[in-house]
């Protein structure tokens, strides 16, 4: 991945290249983004640039042996850590202490297909989408082991930590020691969707960089028209049934939602809240503030004509309650059946 391949943040890319060139690159950088906002491709481009043998015009050459391996994510000095959980495919010993190495091929395959992926897409790729992943102390030990070795080919050993907010206290304390006293020529690149949940002691040791949100054109470049298609279809069908006060038409929706994993259920609720806010803005003549994806436009315009003015606030409250219930492990069939009833009553 070269800087030229990364969408948006033009000035930031230039600044990072200058930091490498002047040997002023911080050894620990916390890249903060919205879910799927481009921090991973930026981190990969920075790592490739820092290890390139023939940098030119503020970008890596793309053809040297180091760049060739970075492009395929197979460079021996490039390491990844990300939240994981046990799966049936793991051995009994691996299930007791799952770490990123067990899922590395799935992670790199996903990153090569679409480096702008979000948390839920990661879990689906790892086949743990019915669970919340975490980064354990066993992972922190592996980080220490990997970074204690000398760089085999590159100028820098690079450790990319995706979602450090998923790290527990014990793991964080162990990682903190490595960040405070890093081995020579080590680069930590942390990518966070919720930086306030990253352990404060780790945040304070990192150079924090907040990525600018993508504008509409940039989002359309990244996301195909089918982006969020299944969730968009589900919430559209549900709201159309609600606007008609057709309880029976909601049954397939809540039954399907009840069958998915908790993380997918929460993602649906969060997407639905944003979708409903966009409908509200369009209904009130504030379309310019709605940031509507082209694939959403027809459904949002139609629903803006059918939902009552008092519906929106009540609906958001209902969805907030659903998220709390899902996090509390309440029976999902009860949760989503009640959600549909409550949305109908809100009309």
Region locations from a protein language model:
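Conserved catalytic/switch belt of AAA+ P-loop NTPases
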Residues: 148, 173-187
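Charged, glycine-rich active-site and insertion segments that engage polyanionic ligands
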Residues: 2-58, 65-69, 181-347
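Structural recognition of the conserved hydrophobic beta-strand(s) that form the central parallel beta-sheet
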Residues: 158-162, 175, 186-192
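Clamp-loader machinery-focused feature within the broader ASCE/P-loop NTPase space
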Residues: 2-170
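Conserved adenine-binding aromatic site and its adjacent loop/helix in ATP-hydrolyzing domains
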Residues: 145, 177, 204
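Conserved strand-to-helix beginnings and helix N-cap segments that scaffold or border functional pockets
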Residues: 169-173, 266
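N-proximal short alpha-helices
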Residues: 112-116, 132-133, 137-140, 148, ...
């Amino acid at each position: 991945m070269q800087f030229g391949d990364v969408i948006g943040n033009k000035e930031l890319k230039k600044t990072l290249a200058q930091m490498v060139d002047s040997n002023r690159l911080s050894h620990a950088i916390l890249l903060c983004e919205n879910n799927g906002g481009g921090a991973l491709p930026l981190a990969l481009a920075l790592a490739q640039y820092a290890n390139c043998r023939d940098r030119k015009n503020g970008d890596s050459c793309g053809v040297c042996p180091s760049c060739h391996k970075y492009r395929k994510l197979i460079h021996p000095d490039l390491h990844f850590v990300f939240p994981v959980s046990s799966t049936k495919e793991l051995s009994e010993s691996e299930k007791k202490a799952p770490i990123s190495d067990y899922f590395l091929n799935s992670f790199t395959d996903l990153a090569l297909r679409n480096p702008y992926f979000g948390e839920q897409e990661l879990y689906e790729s790892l086949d743990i989408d019915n669970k919340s992943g975490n980064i354990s102390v066993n992972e922190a030990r592996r980080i220490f082991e990997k970074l204690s070795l000398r760089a085999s080919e590159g100028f820098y050993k690079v450790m990319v930590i995706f979602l450090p907010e998923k790290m527990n206290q014990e793991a964080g304390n162990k990682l903190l020691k490595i960040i405070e006293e890093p081995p020579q020529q080590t680069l930590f690149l942390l990518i966070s969707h919720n930086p306030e949940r990253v352990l404060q002691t780790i945040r304070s040791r990192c150079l924090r960089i907040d990525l600018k949100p993508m504008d509409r054109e940039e989002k359309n470049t990244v996301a195909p028209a089918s982006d969020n298609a299944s969730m968009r279809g589900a919430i559209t069908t549900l709201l159309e049934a609600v606007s008609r006060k057709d309880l029976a038409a909601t049954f397939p929706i809540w039954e399907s939602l009840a069958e998915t994993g908790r993380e997918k259920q929460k993602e649906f609720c969060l997407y639905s809240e944003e979708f409903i806010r966009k409908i509200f803005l369009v209904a009130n003549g504030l379309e310019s503030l709605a940031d509507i994806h082209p694939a959403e436009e027809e459904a949002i315009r139609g629903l803006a004509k059918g939902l009552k003015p008092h519906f929106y606030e009540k609906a958001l409250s209902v969805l907030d309650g659903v998220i709390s219930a899902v996090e509390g492990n309440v029976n999902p069939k009860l949760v989503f059946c009640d959600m549909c009833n409550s949305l109908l009553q809100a009309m």
